[in-house]
């Protein structure tokens, strides 16, 4: 039965009104919501939109450069290109890296390192995928930006050491920030969290890290949906690090390093009047640029396994028995104590009986009647055994400390070895045993427990030469370190110092002096010096049975160290030099010629004339000078050296 038309019409109208009301209500709610979104929360969504399209990138500062005393560049920055990845901008990191690998050359190691860095860092921080890429690679990446989301080519600065291995043990090198580097700092600089950001890892690069690094800048950049940089919205420039100027003379440093050759050795050159270090060498060395670029496991293991220890800065880290170079200290202690004077003599039959045992002189037949001058000139051991037992270890140790032994010297090299000046208290504390008179006899001739670095030997020599408390300085006039010379005296009787200096002159200039064969002929530059041989191992009975009777018969590691210290000119000391050749044998045959050559190079400020050398040496020296002229870099003041 059908419903009458009027009733049907009314029912439809009610439904229409209901639907219309619902639609109007929904539209009203929507309008209110739209108003809330568009007006009330407009600023918030505008900020969110900006955050989605604006990235903040830190601007690395230019690292301060390092120069020698004449303005020759030792560490500088070179422009380089790298490819970075921001994880949150890449939809599929593996896919993006695979695509990148199709376009440019990236190694499996690069990819592996990238994933390691991504795990360690926030997703919004850029991670370096490939460093030191070519300009062609940069262009290819830029052109393919739409298919490489999160990938950005960047320009940066890389550290370069123009003089390579010549300055490794002074300047050091930089390398990527490690977890350990961050842990050592309470509030790390944000720069240090940039993946593969490089900081000083050794020597001056590390000691002056805060001085050299500078301060970060920042830039706000706008990117499109594909991650391509559209424009730079804002920029705050970085502040470059401060430069560092050294007292080292690059020409002399290169010569000294070359003169050491393949020896495991060190040489230190000091200005006697100011304490400025003119050369600070250690051999063998290595190329620091390899560490900046990423040294291979093979190359690094080769350095670790080299028995000559190229990673050790021997000039400051080495600690060696002084050998006979310590005899000047023993002599001064006896003079100051009034035990001897210049005319005192001791008879040397070739040995001295101490506590029921014979202590031998190096000259088994003996030196006969020995004065102070003769004792140093011919390096008689018995003379020093005798006077040391009378003066005692405490007085000897006191004088040794006045000449810079047993302490570190502030030259901003954190690896410096303080050496050792033993005493009765030291032996009780360290070995829980009493001091014996045999210990005193050993120390008197620079054997036993007394140890020094080549730097300390140079300091002693400069103080002996001048009578002043000269302290070493490696940093020239900068805000980083004050460079005033020490003028205080060593508080010893000037007559005693004069007597020791005169004996050192005889060592190098008297026919029976131990360094006579390495003398300087030029009257204006006559040197005073002292040879030393420090025993590493005594020849055992087992070795003697095998026919080992001399140093040369032994394995290299068991041979004695060779030492020589000197200063010149004798009448007006300007330069002090110390040389230590590990396992080099006698100081007179190995260390003295090297020290003499370096000393003359410093005094002449370049290649000395052949007439400065003994006639017997001139042919060898001429050949050596020609060879060095070919291999040494030619350096001029203010020059940027190309490798």
Where do the PLM segments sit?
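Periplasmic/cell-envelope proteins involved in peptidoglycan metabolism and beta-lactam response
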Residues: 1-297, 307, 319, 341, ...
């Amino acid at each position: 039965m059908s419903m009458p038309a009027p009733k049907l019409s009314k029912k439809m109208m009610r439904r229409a009104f209901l639907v219309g009301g619902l639609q109007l209500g929904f539209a009203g709610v929507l309008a209110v919501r739209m108003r809330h979104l568009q007006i009330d929360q407009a600023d918030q969504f505008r900020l969110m939109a900006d955050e989605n399209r604006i990235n903040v990138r830190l601007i690395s500062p230019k690292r301060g450069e390092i120069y020698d005393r004449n303005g020759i560049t030792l560490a500088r920055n070179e422009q380089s290109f790298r490819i970075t990845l921001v994880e949150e901008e890449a939809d599929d990191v593996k896919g993006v890296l695979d695509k990148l690998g199709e376009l440019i050359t990236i190694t499996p190691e690069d990819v592996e390192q990238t994933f390691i860095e991504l795990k360690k860092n926030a997703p919004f921080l850029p991670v370096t995928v490939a460093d030191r890429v070519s300009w062609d690679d940069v262009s290819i990446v830029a052109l393919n930006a739409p298919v490489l989301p999160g990938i950005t080519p960047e320009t940066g600065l890389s550290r370069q050491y123009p003089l390579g291995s010549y300055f490794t043990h002074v300047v050091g090198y930089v390398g990527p920030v490690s977890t350990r580097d961050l842990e050592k700092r309470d509030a790390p600089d944000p720069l240090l969290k940039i993946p593969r950001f490089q900081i000083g890892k050794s020597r001056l690069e590390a000691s002056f890290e805060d001085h050299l690094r500078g301060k970060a800048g920042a830039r706000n950049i706008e990117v499109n949906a594909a991650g391509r940089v559209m424009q730079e919205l804002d920029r705050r420039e970085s502040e470059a690090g401060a430069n560092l100027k050294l007292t080292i003379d690059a020409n002399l440093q290169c010569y000294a390093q070359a003169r050491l050759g393949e020896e495991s050795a060190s040489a230190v050159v000091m200005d006697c009047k100011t304490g400025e270090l003119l050369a600070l060498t250690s051999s063998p060395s290595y190329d620091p640029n390899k560490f900046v670029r990423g040294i291979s496991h093979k190359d690094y293991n080769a350095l670790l396994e080299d028995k000559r220890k190229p990673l050790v800065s021997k000039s400051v880290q080495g600690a060696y028995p002084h050998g006979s170079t310590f005899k000047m200290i023993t002599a001064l202690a006896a003079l100051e104590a009034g035990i001897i004077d210049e005319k005192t003599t001791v008879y040397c039959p070739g040995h001295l009986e101490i506590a029921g045992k014979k202590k031998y002189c190096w000259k088994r037949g003996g030196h006969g009647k020995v004065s102070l001058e003769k004792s140093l000139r011919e390096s008689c051991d018995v003379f020093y055994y005798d006077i040391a037992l009378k003066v005692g270890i405490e007085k000897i140790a006191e004088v040794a400390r006045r000449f810079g032994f047993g302490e570190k010297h502030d030259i901003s090299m954190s690896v410096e070895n303080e050496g050792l000046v033993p005493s009765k208290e030291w032996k009780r504390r360290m070995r829980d045993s009493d001091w014996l008179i045999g210990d005193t006899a050993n120390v008197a001739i620079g054997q036993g427990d007394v140890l020094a670095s080549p730097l300390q030997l140079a300091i002693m020599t400069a103080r002996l030469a001048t009578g002043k408390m000269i302290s070493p300085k490696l940093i020239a006039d900068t805000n980083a370190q004050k460079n005033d010379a020490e003028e205080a005296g060593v508080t010893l009787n000037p007559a005693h110092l004069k007597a020791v200096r005169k004996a050192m002159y005889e060592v190098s200039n008297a026919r029976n002096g131990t360094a006579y064969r390495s003398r300087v002929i030029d009257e204006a530059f006559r040197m005073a010096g002292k040879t030393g041989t420090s025993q590493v191992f005594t020849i055992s009975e087992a070795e003697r049975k095998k026919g080992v009777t001399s140093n040369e018969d032994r394995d290299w590691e068991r041979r004695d160290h060779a030492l020589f210290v000197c200063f010149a000119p004798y009448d007006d000391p300007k330069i002090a030099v110390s040389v230590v050749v590990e396992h080099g044998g006698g100081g007179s045959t190995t260390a003295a010629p090297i020290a003499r050559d370096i000393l003359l190079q410093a005094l002449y400020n370049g290649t000395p004339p052949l007439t400065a050398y003994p006639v017997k040496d001139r042919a060898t020296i001429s050949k050596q000078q020609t060879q060095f002229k070919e291999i040494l870099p030619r350096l001029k003041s203010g020059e940027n050296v190309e490798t």
